[in-house]
Amino acid sequence: MKKKLVVLGLLAVVLVLVIVGLCLWLPSASKEPDNHVYTRAAVAADAKQCLEIGRDTLRDGGSAVDAAIAALLCVGLMNAHSMGIGVGLFLTIYNSTTRKAEVINAREVAPRLAFASMFNSSEQSQKGGLSVAVPGEIRGYELAHQRHGRLPWARLFQPSIQLARQGFPVGKGLAAVLENKRTVIEQQPVLCEVFCRDRKVLREGERLTLPRLADTYEMLAIEGAQAFYNGSLMAQIVKDIQAAGGIVTAEDLNNYCAELIEHPLNISLGDAVLYMPSARLSGPVLALILNILKGYNFSRESVETPEQKGLTYHRIVEAFRFAYAKRTLLGDPKFVDVTEVVRNMTSEFFAAQLRSQISDHTTHPISYYKPEFYTPDDGGTAHLSVVAEDGSAVSATSTINLYFGSKVCSPVSGILFNNMDDFSSPSITNEFGAPPSPANFIQPGKQPLLSMCPTIMVGQDGQVRMVVGAAGGTQITTDTALAIIYNLWFGYDVKRAVEEPRLHNKLLPNVTTVERNIDQAVTAALETRHHHTQIASTFIAVVQAIVRTAGGWAAASDSRKGGEPAGY
């Protein structure tokens, strides 16, 4: 009898252990794996519901471009502080069938009545109707869809129309900016009507509905891009901007065209090619950073010991400083001859000359890097990366310029408009002693210099290896470079490449900003080499990346903005 009881007791213990084990295992087995590797297609962006919209568009037979447009329309709702249909974007597109890359430029342009000295202060270029440029976002979607779309145009709008009507919880990124811009928003009746409850800005998790934008999306879905530029929306858009003191006219909207660039900027990295936009974007800056650094033959060993890691990061920061010194010469190639500048910035010989000027034991005064002009900060961006089942890819970055752009929001259409603060102005001085860049002065029809660099890396076999880009003002270029360096040279998986603590230096001001959780060995090594370091108040930009691995497409959406990838 005693023996029987012992056996029964042991069986009971085993049964309990099995049940506990199943309880622990089953929930995790039903979840998506933490590494986010997808066998067929992937999307990385900074809003979960938008990722799911992009993924479902791919599942429904949509192309990479279809998924990008559908997801961007959603991001324009959920992260309205960063982008929307009243702004502009660039798309880098790779077609796996033709094995060709192209860029679509749909950045906003200065109105025909604009002139170089139209702003006497930064406030004028940042806020109000006068600061609004001619939006290009919808024309960009149209051109991309005409060239690469598979699903009907209207289908791409439907998920976001539903989302705008039903509402959604305010996410981490939008909530942080609403709190940061609380005073401005609560004092603007139209903005506060959208983003406030009981005259107080919405907090994370509270519900935001956008019924006016839903109506506008419906009109665009039915009428196409024409509705915005010379159709049923056009007159109201002009009226809203001019009522706020702006100079955008019907003629400006009628004449706006997105631009196809069939031969984008590219450089070699080992046995791969990196495709990105040239000037007026910061592709040449990214190219110069990587060309300088590839001469060091970085590898996993470059960051193995504190000494090696410190030297490696010093070299990276010095490459940033040289590249940003040359950035000040860039501008819109339709108005400024930047051929020689871009040729130098993408030349391995030129990069080697700059590399030879990097001292491993110290940094140098600003004048050592020979900056010629100063260009203003930019900000308020959103990026997404997409890879479709056929191996085609899109890297897209859209921007409203500064958070909430011009702060001009239509009480009728719900459209929030950009500002022109990315231009330089002869009337606005800076504290760094460098004159404003004439290459970036305002002219009618001109586009300003920007830090965006949506990038696609392709191997010799014609297959995409990496799709990457970032959002976050002038930090975009350095963060995109770091993600590539971390993955390609240091051997970090894509999740670590996106999440790894980062640093930034744009030469002016003479400060290296580091994220709070960066390795202390890096900070100590920089300070030993006379770098002025400061801890970032929040985070340094937000990266979205997809990388080809043996197991499929590994995707990472930056947790700094609450991102999470999707795929299948």
Curated annotation (Swiss-Prot):
GO molecular-function term, one example from the UniProt record: glutathione hydrolase activity
Listed transmembrane segments: 5-26
Pathway: Sulfur metabolism; glutathione metabolism
EC number(s) given by UniProt: 3.4.19.13, 2.3.2.2
Residues the record marks as carrying a glycan: N95, N120, N230, N266, N297, N344, N510
Cytoplasmic side: 1-4
PROSITE patterns in the cross-refs: G_GLU_TRANSPEPTIDASE (PS00462)
Reactions performed catalytically: an N-terminal (5-L-glutamyl)-[peptide] + an alpha-amino acid = 5-L-glutamyl amino acid + an N-terminal L-alpha-aminoacyl-[peptide]; glutathione + H2O = L-cysteinylglycine + L-glutamate; an S-substituted glutathione + H2O = an S-substituted L-cysteinylglycine + L-glutamate
Catalytic-site annotation from UniProt: T381
Cellular localisation: Membrane
Annotated residues for binding of L-glutamate: R107, T399, L450, S451
Domain of life: Eukaryota
Annotated GO CC locations: extracellular exosome; plasma membrane
Coiled coil: none
Function: Hydrolyzes and transfers gamma-glutamyl moieties from glutathione and other gamma-glutamyl compounds to acceptors.
Name of protein: Putative glutathione hydrolase 3 proenzyme
The organism of origin for this protein: Homo sapiens
